[in-house]
Amino acid sequence: MNLYERLFEFVSTRTYRNRVLKEHDAIAGIIGRIAGDIDICRILGYEAAMIGDRRNKPYGKPIISENVVGRIRNIKDFVSDRAVDAFGKAMDVLGPYGPDRNWDIEKHWRDIKIVQLWMGGKQLCQMEAARYFFNCETL
């Protein structure tokens, strides 16, 4: 199960003051932001796949250039930051169940942190983005 499914199950079944958690304003705001982050990250993931899969022929080799790498790394940087934030908020909502290894939220959070460090980390992604968007040559 992924983050959305675990969080949906938790806020739909747990109650606080005779109301399910998802009906409280504070929790609804947090889970609404998490749902938006998940949706935006999914769309950007498809966009990155489409950018990286451009070909000059239907079955030719992908066209990879510095511009493509810069755009994909920029998307990776943004999406991994939003995912870490979403997992942190979800662990806050889940309370003591958030870091519990039986719920797998903590494992997914660790995996996202590894993805954040993958391909050189945040600074390298920012330098690639600056190189692409602002034509920096000395970075």
Spans of features found by a protein language model:
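Alpha-helical interface subdomain recognition
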Residues: 1-139
